[in-house]
From Swiss-Prot:
Extracellular compartment residues: 1-765, 821-826, 895-918, 988-994
Polar residues compositional bias, start-end: 250-260, 278-300, 1455-1466
SMART domains in UniProt: GPS (SM00303)
Designated name of the protein: Latrophilin Cirl
Biased composition (Low complexity): 381-391, 1298-1314, 1328-1348, 1631-1654
GO molecular function: carbohydrate binding; G protein-coupled receptor activity
Topological domain spans for side Cytoplasmic: 787-799, 848-873, 940-966, 1016-1684
Spans annotated as Disordered: 181-300, 370-391, 1080-1100, 1228-1255, 1270-1353, 1441-1520, 1587-1669
Length: 1684
């Protein structure tokens, strides 16, 4: 079976012969007996200058061809044993007149037996390789469909020659080469060809029977495998003897598998030996998979150019010999297609003797992302395809697959390789011109004239085209001339003649060297291989140096000779040592305008190398030599070499060395070459180094300059002895300790790599985009969170630091994303690098400051309260951005090219400036951050072991958590930046670990964004709460998101009775887009039903709404951040503390009376007072129509009159009770009384609750007025106060509804009259008077007292005028919309009213007056003002002593209650109008007479005029200051008391000047039954230095220890109605009045509650009230629902 595997046919190859005949002579062709002439090609003309040119004429054309030469010659010689043809124009014509022509014929002598069965078309010569038609003649490769299918393993090689010889015709194709016909017969015998060099090439063929497997018809070779070792088995090439017999088993159509190798440069031989390669035929599919011989016989490894192509076990695989380089033209020669691994050899172009060769190699194609699928298919089709051995597939396209279809089946790995001509130009090293050969012969003659030879050489090199061999000959002649002149100069006795002869010789030599360096001769240099180029360049430099020193040695006195030609400036200087005063500089500025290069030799170095008192120096400057003396791996032209080295892998016999070289950077010679010598051919070491200034030829896309010199021994550039002193974008300064030829080498940034992203693969690029996008999104969310939810945070230094860190990180991410897309030539590249440098320095500095801030917090009083430290933050800003900008500016001044000469637009160039201005500052900041973090951790450990207060422990835990998060943040950011840096550096050096760094950067950068969002946003409880509030308040969000049941984590007080909310309290959902102050109320009844009791917990949760009241202060008052806790309590004096529970943050419960362990400076603190709940009405059923609205349903027994609810008439079990709530903000007490604190001016008095900050120096207060919404089931919102004026009526009579209709009309008229807020405010005071009057009547009835007479009627006029002036400029920025007041009810007709109480800090409620910043002494420097203000101070002082500690520490102790009872018994000082009246005058008087009332009215009138004048002068003054607001609030409090007293006098009630109105601090103690009055609740907050509002540095000089006045609310009293909203416009009021339903129930203005048969003593309901002030000056109030 072995004989069936392959059949080898061996026969003698026909000889290939060439015959020539000069013009005018006969061409005779003869063959041996039995052989006939078989012409291959012929031409009458001239292709070579050496043939038939005895006189060396070089003017003849070498591209002379007669197209019909072969036809004419065939007519005379074809199929003849011999013939003779005259080479004359009469026979062939004259294709090129004036040129001496010759006739050239290529033929074979074949046997007569073969000619009877074959055609007359012969095969082309070996170097023509025209085996098939060029399908894609693109010059780089082509498909040659010669063989489809092949043996497994080695595969059958295509025949070098066609199987049948034929006549090559030139008709119609314009050339000498035709396509051979289909091969249908056996291969021809061997033939020999006579090459120009006289060598013969043996050609032989053999055929092999092949079978095509059914499963594969493409016959493509297997993918090649690159190996760097050669221990694989290769098929042997064995010589065989020619034989004319063809075995019977052979197939006539089977192709030959013998590979014919040419002798030059390939793997063949030159001795005519037949080389054959054995291979196995393909097996059938059945045997290919199962035969045991597949692994042995069917395995072969081919080695081409040291590339091992392993095709073991792959059926139907051919080897790489089916790949060909396409035909092309180069150096006036046509290079036909050549098989990979072969060398195409042909004679040199006309006018030159020798041979030219060019090799076809297989190169690896670098992946190009710009190729799409179609381009790759076409590229694969046009470059790599196997030869077909099937005659049917060769010329019958119907039986073969199309080429594109075959390309689809090409293995992907093989498609990465393509056949390429190597090197880029043909090798013409052996081509020499005839005239230079003549000069070489002349210079070697003994009596030749050296001057004449030098002149001829300069003329020839300037006018003639040279080839690679000519360069070698020319430089050799230059050296020979100098050597001969050295001996011949002695024959000239005259010194002047000697110098003249040598100078003329030097001029010719310099001119010749300039001609060789000229641009027109660049192709001649490229004809040489790299080694020969370097050798020729070295020979040229040494030849010039030898000739120059020949002249220098001849000169015996001081002289300077300059030889200047186009490309060379040569200066020979002979200097006397005594005349050398300074350094010698070359060249002069006017001598060499081509370049600004400069070389400076120090004087000491010259004197050391003097001889005989003379110093001989040779300077030379070259132009265009830099394009010749290129560094290794860059011996081609610059533009081509970039693409060549980057995009191909040269697979040659020295591929091992080349593989390592390709990993190196591409370097160019980036300066002109300049030379200085002190001795001929010697590298003289100098005691002092020379200085060179070299100008950069290329300033863009170059980096890393290196000073080098040309080493004559190694023929290469070397940096030994030279160093770079300084460099910039255009010049470099070098220092060398020896002399020779110098230049600058620089790295080239590949222009084909347009940006950094071109270095990424597809996945890497996508992942980087995603990672940066994620990080940017989360950073933006963090910044928006800090800005939108600004009030959640204390305006602290830490918050400012993190905002700046986020801004820097955002800038870094965006600049990096923009920079990796930019090219190095982009104008934005330098700017991006500069700003990125600044952003990184700023970011690292902020990290350092964050660590330092944590350290300073732990080592100072800031541990207790984190506040905004503006001076410190300003220092951080200055150090961070100022220092970063300064460093970048210094870097730009020192070396601007640092930002533009790097490979990528996101890195600086790695030089000294980079390490000094980037690496060093970043390391310093990072080390400082680590150091401060370590110190902070030590301090925390020490503090945790010491005894601290609860608040300090809380704050310490917060700081500990911040430091941990910051340290993790620091580590993560360091990992991101380090990964990015190493990835960029690795990508530049093409390291294998680059991908690891890239994916590390992607992962760490994504984690950085997630970490910012989670640990800096989500983990913050306050931000989570703000997120929920933000979702609920925006109507554009889905309702399912806005109306979700929510329980906040703020502090809530659960009373001792039932839950906070009633049953079925429901959920809360905001219906207004603006921030509103509202509190939905539920019910709070005693539950006897077990099911209702189980619902209390859920109702309580629903009643606690985190965003129920979030109105903000006006802009003028927005900076009043009060570090306050939340004080809650009942409306009764505290008597018991049992059963009270506080709902802490995090939904944890604890007992009251203790500080919250998790509270901090910005959290809530709960302090409350409590009285056991008295008799409660039965629990009723609660309904709600809208999410933020609670209605209720009356229990069985029918609807009661509304008058009962207003006046507390009827049974106490069914009447909801309301008391007066007074909210005041004041300072925290100082724990160390009498001790002066930092930031204060003196001792700080006590205040209601403990201080949160030891540096609180002054008080601040904000007045809160409650607004009420009264609704009734089944109707729209009612007016807010008119019902209190109506008498009670039976609810079941018809007259009741008639009276309601009349009252509705009265209300409309009354409401129209209230056209301004001034009238409305007056009505507030009027209603307050009714409540107080009713209380006094009840008290006096119980005590048997009589009513006092009413004041005169004229007092009302004064009151009305003053009130209108006082409230003229009141404004509001937090109006409640109509939708809030006009909500209906679903309670039905049997329901009762529901009061929803909303506590707000609306500016309209706070009554801000726009008056000037006046002095208190100036304002009250009269009898009226002084008395009022002094009386106010007395009231404040009394209030301060009364409340100073009553609600401290979160509980009310028995000691505080005793102090409070003691303060209740103190007399109240009365008001007087005189200026010199003391504050404590008449303190024993408890009532006033009518005369005193009248006198007080006159005082009020005068005071009104005084304040009116102040108001008129207030406009145009600066904004309100803290001191101004304090005075205004004091005036406001006094004004309200005066207004209340006017209402008393207007209605004839006795005026008690020492009694405050209901709702004020002193009104609580003024009644006869103080236990029935509501307890006073104070929401107190300490103001630290640096808070948002800012602490008052000092109190007023007149009252340094007096507490600020208590600002009363418009109290509704135990029997009063709800008050109208103070910020509603008249238009809104009218709209509400039009929507009134006829079911409203009111009563007359006369108070008749004492006559009601169902009236009961006033019942005081226990209602828990909690208010929380966050950092945004937003008060969140939670009021226990009213009882039903």
């Amino acid at each position: 079976m072995a004989s069936n595997n392959y059949i080898q046919i061996m026969e003698k190859a026909p000889k290939y012969q060439t015959a020539y005949a000069c013009e005018g002579k006969k061409l005779t062709i003869e063959c041996e007996q039995g052989e006939l002439i078989n012409l291959i090609r012929a031409n009458y003309g001239r292709f070579s200058i050496t043939i038939c040119n005895d006189h060396g004429n070089v003017e003849w054309s070498v591209n002379c061809m007669f197209p019909k030469s072969l036809t004419v010659l065939n007519s005379r010689c074809a199929h003849k044993n011999s013939c003779s043809v005259l080479a004359a124009t009469s026979m062939f014509g004259d294709p090129c007149p004036g040129t001496h022509k010759y006739l050239e014929a290529h033929y074979q002598c074949v046997s007569a037996a073969q000619t009877s069965t074959t055609t007359n078309r012969p095969s082309p010569p070996p170097w023509v390789l025209n085996n098939g038609p060029p399908i894609f003649g693109n010059g780089s490769g082509l498909i040659h469909p010669t063989n489809i299918g092949g043996g497994s393993g080695g595969a059958s090689a295509p025949p070098r020659l066609p199987t049948l010889p034929g006549v090559v015709g030139i008709n119609g194709n314009g050339g000498m080469f035709n396509i051979p016909p289909p091969a249908t017969h056996a291969t021809p015998p061997g033939s020999t060809a006579t090459l120009p060099g006289g060598r013969l090439k043996g050609v032989a063929t053999s055929t092999t029977t092949t079978k095509h497997p059914a499963g594969r018809r493409d016959g493509l070779p297997p993918p090649p495998q690159l190996h760097h070792h050669h221990n694989h088995h290769t098929d042997e090439t064995t010589p065989t003897k020619p034989s004319g017999k063809v075995p019977a088993a052979s197939n006539a159509t089977a192709p030959s598998n013998t590979r014919i190798l040419t002798g030059v440069g390939g793997g063949g031989t030159d001795d005519g030996t037949l080389l054959t390669t054995k291979s196995s035929p393909n097996r059938t599919p059945g045997t290919a998979a199962s035969g045991p011989s597949v692994s042995s016989n069917g395995s072969a490894v081919r080695t081409i150019n040291n590339i091992n192509l392993n095709a073991a076990g792959m059926a139907g695989a051919d080897d790489e010999t089916k790949l060909f380089c396409g035909p092309t033209h180069a150096r006036n020669l046509f290079w036909n297609m050549t098989r990979v691994g072969d060398v195409n050899v042909q004679p040199c172009p006309g006018g030159a003797a020798g041979i030219a060769k060019w090799r076809c190699v297989l190169m690896k194609r670098m992946p190009d992302s710009s190729f799409d699928e179609d381009d790759e298919e076409m590229a694969g089709t046009s470059t790599t395809t196997p030869m077909s051995t099937s005659s049917d597939c060769l010329y019958n396209s119907s039986s073969c697959e199309p080429p594109v279809t075959m390309a689809h089946k090409v293995n992907q790995r093989l498609r990465n390789f393509e056949p390429t001509w190597h090197p880029l130009t043909p090798d013409l090293t052996q081509c020499r011109s005839l005239w230079l050969n003549n000069l070489e012969m002349r210079v070697n003659q003994r009596d030749s004239s050296l001057i004449s030879i030098a002149n001829d050489m300069s003329e020839v090199t300037s006018s003639k085209t040279l080839y690679g061999g000519d360069m070698l000959v020319t430089t050799k002649i230059i050296q020979t001339v100098s050597e001969k002149m050295l001996h011949d100069k002695e024959t000239f006795p005259d010194q002047r003649q000697r110098e003249a002869m040598i100078m003329e010789l030097l001029h010719c030599v310099v001119k010749t060297g300039s001609n060789l360096l000229d641009e027109s001769q660049l192709s001649s240099w490229l004809d040489l291989n790299p080694e020969d180029q370097m050798r020729v360049a070295t020979s040229l430099l040494t030849g010039l140096e030898y000739n120059a020193f020949l002249l220098a040695d001849t000169i015996i006195r001081e002289r300077s000779v300059v030889q200047k030609v186009k490309n060379i400036l040569l200066s020979v200087r002979v200097l006397e040592t005594k005349t050398i005063q300074s350094s010698v500089v070359f060249p002069d500025s006017d001598q060499w305008p081509i370049s600004s290069d400069r070389i400076e030799l120090p004087r000491a170095a010259l004197i050391e190398n003097s001889e005989g008192g003379l110093v001989r120096i040779v300077f030379a400057a070259f132009d265009r030599l830099e394009s010749i003396l290129k560094p290794s791996y860059d011996h081609f032209d610059l533009k081509s070499s970039r693409s060549y080295v980057r995009n191909t892998a040269i697979l040659t016999n020295d591929s091992d060395a080349s593989a390592g070289d390709l990993q190196q950077r591409l370097r160019i010679l980036n300066s002109k070459v300049i030379s200085a010598s002190l001795g001929k051919g010697r590298h003289i070491q100098l005691s002092q180094p020379i200085t060179l200034t070299l100008k950069h030829l290329k300033t863009e896309n170059v980096t890393n300059p290196t000073c080098v010199f040309w080493n004559y021994i190694d023929h290469a550039w070397s940096a030994n002895g030279c160093s770079l002193e300084s460099t910039n974008r255009t010049h470099s300064v070098c220092s060398c300790n020896h002399l020779t030829n110098f230049a600058i080498l620089m790295d080239v940034v590949d222009e084909h790599q347009h940006s950094l992203f071109t270095m990424f693969d597809g996945n890497m690029r996508i992942f980087i985009y995603i990672s940066i996008a994620i990080c940017v999104v989360f950073i933006v969310i963090a910044l928006l969170t800090l800005k939108l939810f600004n009030g959640v945070f204390v305006k602290s230094a830490r918050t400012s630091i993190y905002i700046n860190i986020y801004i820097c990180l955002l800038a870094i991410e965006l600049l990096f994303l923009l920079g990796i897309e930019q090219t190095e030539t982009s104008i934005f590249c330098g700017f991006i690098t500069v700003f990125l440098h600044c952003a990184i320095l700023s970011g690292t500095s902020w990290f350092c400051y964050e660590a330092f801030h944590s350290y300073s917090t732990l080592t100072s009083d800031e541990l207790l309260l984190e506040v905004d430290q503006t001076p410190k933050v300003n220092c951080y800003y200055l150090l961070s951005y100022g220092l970063s900008l300064s460093v970048v500016a210094i870097s730009l001044v020192i070396n601007p090219s640092t930002y533009t000469q790097n490979d990528y637009c996101v890195l600086m160039e790695a030089n000294a400036v980079f390490y000094a201005t980037f690496v060093a500052p970043v390391l310093i900041f990072f080390m400082a951050a680590i150091g401060y973090t370590f110190l902070s951790w030590i301090i925390m450990c020490r503090k945790s072991r010491t005894g601290l207060k609860t608040k300090e422990h809380t704050r310490l835990a917060t700081v500990r958590f911040d430091i941990r998060c910051s340290f993790v943040f620091f580590l993560l950011l360091s990992a991101v930046w380090c990964s990015a840096y190493f990835y960029l550096r690795g990508a530049k050096m093409d390291e294998d670990v680059t991908g690891i760094y890239g994916y590390n950067f992607i992962c760490f950068n994504t984690l950085l964004g997630l970490y910012i969002f989670v640990f800096h946003c989500i983990q913050n409880e306050k931000i989570r709460r703000e997120y929920r509030k933000y979702v609920r308040q925006h109507a554009w969000l889905p309702k399912c998101l806005r109306c979700s049941k929510t329980s906040i984590s703020s502090g809530i007080v659960a009373g001792g009775g039932t839950g906070l909310g009633g049953t079925n309290a429901g959920t809360l959902c905001s219906v207004s887009t603006a921030k509103k102050s509202k509190l939905p109320l539920g019910t709070n009844d005693d539950a006897h039903d077990e099911q209702q009791q189980q619902q209390h917990m859920s109702a309580t949760e629903d009643a606690i709404m985190g965003a129920s009241s979030d109105c903000e202060l006006n802009e003028a008052q927005q900076r009043r951040t009060l570090k306050s806790g939340l004080i809650t309590g009942t409306l009764q004096p505290s008597q018991s503390l049992g059963g009270h529970v506080v709902l802490e943050r995090g939904n944890t419960l604890r007992s009251t009376g203790h500080a919250s362990p998790t509270s901090s400076a910005g959290s809530t603190h709960l302090i409350f007072a409590h009285k056991p709940q008295q008799q409660q009405p039965p629990l009723g059923e609660a309904y709600y129509h809208q999410p933020d609205y609670y209605s209720w349903k009356q229990t069985a027994g029918g609807m009661k009159a509304q008058r009962e609810y207003y006046n507390n008439a009827g049974a106490a079990t069914s009447s909801p009770q309301q008391a007066h709530e007074v909210f005041y903000w004041t300072q925290k007490p100082n724990s160390q009384h009498g001790k002066k604190k930092r930031g204060g001016v003196g001792a700080i008095p006590a205040s209601p609750s403990g201080s949160l900050h030891s540096r609180a120096t002054a008080a601040s207060q904000v007045l809160f007025y409650p607004s009420y919404k009264k609704t009734k089931p089944g109707q729209q919102a009612h007016p807010h106060y008119a019902e209190a004026l109506d008498p009670p009526q039976p609810p079941n009579t018809a007259a009741y509804y008639q009276q309601q209709q009349q009252l509705r009309q009265q209300r409309q008229q009354q409401q129209q009259q209230l056209s301004s807020d001034e009238e409305q405010a007056e009505q507030h005071a009027h209603l307050l008077h009714l409540q107080h009057q009713q209380q006094q009547q009840q008290q006096r009835r119980a005590g048997g007292q009589q009513q006092l007479p009413a004041p005169p009627p004229h007092m009302a006029q004064y009151q009305q005028e003053f009130m209108q002036r006082q409230y003229r400029n009141k404004h509001s920025n937090c109006d409640l919309g109509d939708a809030y007041y006009n909500q209906g009810s679903v309670g039905g007709a049997d329901g009762g009213p529901v009061y929803e109480e909303i506590l707000s800090n609306r500016n309209s409620d706070a009554q801000h007056y726009e008056v000037g910043d006046f002095d208190v002494d100036e304002v009250y420097n009269n009898s009226v003002g002084t008395g009022v203000f002094n009386n106010m101070r007395a009231a404040v002082a009394a209030g301060g002593s009364r409340y100073g500690g009553s609600l401290s520490g979160g509980s009310v102790s028995s000691r505080n209650q005793q102090q409070q009872q003691h303060s209740l018994a103190q007399p109240i000082s009365a008001r007087r109008c005189t200026a010199d009246e003391d504050d404590d005058e008449d303190e024993d008087d408890e009532e006033t007479t009518a005369a005193e009332q009248l006198h007080d009215g006159v005082c009020d009138e005068e005071e009104e005029d005084e304040e009116s004048d102040m108001e008129d002068d207030s406009h145009g003054l600066p904004p309100q200051s803290a001191e101004r607001m304090r005075r205004l609030m004091a005036l406001q409090d006094e004004d309200f008391k005066r207004r209340f007293q006017r209402q008393q006098r207007k209605h004839g009630a006795p005026v008690d000047y020492g009694t405050l109105p209901p709702g004020s601090a002193q009104a609580v103690i003024g009644g006869a039954h103080p236990e029935h009055n509501g307890a006073v609740f104070g929401v107190s907050g300490g103001v630290g230095e640096g808070s948002m509002r800012g602490a008052l540095r000092q109190q007023h000089a007149k009252s340094p220890s007096a507490r600020l006045a208590v600002n009363e609310l418009f109290g509704h009293g135990n029997t009063g109605p709800p008050l109208p909203p103070a910020n509603q416009t008249p238009a809104q009021k009218r709209q509400q009045l039009q929507k009134l339903s006829p079911q409203s129930t009111t009563s007359s203005s006369s108070h008749t509650s004492h006559s009601n048969p169902h009236s009961h003593p006033p019942h005081h309901q226990q209602r828990h009230l909690s208010a929380m002030l966050d950092e945004n000056n937003t008060v969140r109030c939670y009021l226990e629902p009213l009882a039903k």
